Amino acid sequence: MYGESLVKLMLALDVMDEKKAILIAKETSEYVDSIKIGYPLVLATGLNIIDKIKESTNKEVICDFKVADIPSTNEKIAELTLNHADGIICQGFVGSDSVSAILNVARAKNKKVIVVTEMSHPGATEYLQNVAEDMAKMADRLKVDGIVAPSTRPERLKEIKSIAKDAFVISPGVGAQGGNLSDVLNVLNENDYVIIGRAIYENENPKNAAKKYKIQM
């Protein structure tokens, strides 16, 4: 890892080509603490891409599948995913029984569960924001490992973090979505992660881009 930093850097690797994904992951691994991948890469390449990234970087890989189904289906998705990944992201709005189904699988495998409270895009203010605090309370009650809260709205990030006080935060929105890193760093601590994606992987030099952000943290 590069130096000692207060807040951790999570790379959102939303590319769709296996070779490109592994190359960027390798190039940036000195500066990132964790790698988050989602449906675009996994649907394009298969679940084995998780193992390939882990082997090539020695970093944890979190699957951002935002799982949102009934408990029995959530359990199946978690089982398949966590045979490979170090953690999985699920939606909180489906309720505590669906989240608990994922938690049960994760606990048996010693893996992480991260619950979405409020997303970073503008549309999240239409519906999701209205119940974000309730989902943060649920996350706190269930003792999930982490929560997702937006860098694009630092005041909301602060409020949500204060509710789910024992969970670490992964926070998207810095970079391409316009979130201000300095504002976010005033809220987060050494257990938390700033998520940066396009500003790194779309840069002509992803390694330097990752280094630039890491230095600021």
From Swiss-Prot:
Coiled-coil residue spans: none
Enzyme class (EC, first level): lyase
Protein family membership: Belongs to the OMP decarboxylase family. Type 1 subfamily.
Pathways involved: Pyrimidine metabolism; UMP biosynthesis via de novo pathway; UMP from orotate: step 2/2
Highest classification ranks of the organism: Archaea, Methanobacteriati, Methanobacteriota, Methanomada group, Methanococci
Protein name according to UniProt: Orotidine 5'-phosphate decarboxylase
EC number from the UniProt entry: 4.1.1.23
Domain of life: Archaea
Sequence positions that bind substrate: 14, 36, 64-73, 120, 172-182, 197-198
Molecular function via GO: orotidine-5'-phosphate decarboxylase activity
SUBUNIT field: Homodimer.
SMART domains: OMPdecase
GO cellular component: cytosol
Function: Catalyzes the decarboxylation of orotidine 5'-monophosphate (OMP) to uridine 5'-monophosphate (UMP).
Record key words, sorted: Decarboxylase, Lyase, Pyrimidine biosynthesis
Gene3D superfamilies reported for this sequence: Aldolase class I (3.20.20.70)
Active-site residues, record numbering mapped to chain: K66 (proton donor)
Catalytic reaction equation(s): orotidine 5'-phosphate + H(+) = UMP + CO2
GO biological process, one term: 'de novo' UMP biosynthetic process
